[in-house]
Design a protein with these regions (language model features):
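Short catalytic/ligand-binding loop motif for oxyanion handling, primarily in non-cytosolic enzymes
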Residues: 64-68
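Active-site-adjacent betaalpha module
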Residues: 1-8, 17-18, 35, 44, ...
């Protein structure tokens, strides 16, 4: 059984861009989202985690005007920046309601003082944000990981957190991916790298 003292949820990119039809990445992810009921399962996890007192860490994606000035970019970053995905006009202004950078409405009721939104990760993994620091300062050594995209940000967070010494459980039906091939590739990697791979219902049974 999990416990609230040293176990927390880490959710990558639970934002409009890949999860809702108005998002610029939704066309690539919608089939897998529908197949595994990603939004429904993420909502279940958020709701029960709040009810039972588990901390929730969100590692979001944001891009700003200054990111356009990067002198070199990898393919994924180039695509996102050129299409102004996860876009914010400024670090000093609020995120526009319903924009690609906004959190999906389904999880907003569960965002409270036990939800820690860390700095945005810039490419795929948490190396460039404060996720590790926040987890350590909160006494967390076990992470239940879910979110978007299964083969990119979720995979990269899993790898880095494993390297940092965390016990990482990936929730395989609370993720989404840009197509079935990408989803299956992610599942293969989870099986080799994560400490455990569980379904939403299997996680809920241990909360």
């Amino acid at each position: 059984m999990f416990n609230q003292k040293n176990v927390a949820f880490v959710i990558t990119d639970p934002q409009v861009e890949f999860l809702k039809s108005t998002g610029k990445g939704f066309g690539a992810t919608k089939d897998v989202l529908e197949k595994v009921n990603t939004i429904e399962n993420l909502t279940k996890l958020f709701a029960l985690a709040k009810e039972r007192g588990y901390k929730r860490f969100i590692s979001p994606h944001y891009f700003y005007p200054h990111d356009h000035k990067w002198q070199f970019k990898a393919a994924g970053a180039t695509m996102m920046i050129e299409n102004e995905m996860f876009w914010r006009d400024s670090q000093y202004s609020a995120i526009p309601e319903g924009s690609g950078a906004d959190m999906i409405e389904e999880i907003k009721p569960f965002l409270d003082e036990d939800t820690i939104v860390v700095n945005g990760h810039k490419i795929f993994g948490p190396e460039s944000n404060d996720l590790n620091l926040q987890l350590r300062k909160n006494g967390i050594d076990t992470v239940i990981l879910a979110g978007m995209n299964a083969n990119l940000c979720v995979d990269s967070h899993m790898r880095e957190l494993i390297e940092l010494g965390y016990n990482v459980i990936v929730v395989n039906d609370a993720v989404g991916a840009p197509g079935e091939e990408a989803y299956q590739a992610a599942l293969t990697n989870y099986g080799y790298i994560a400490n455990q791979v569980l379904t939403t219902e299997e996680v809920i049974a241990q909360l």
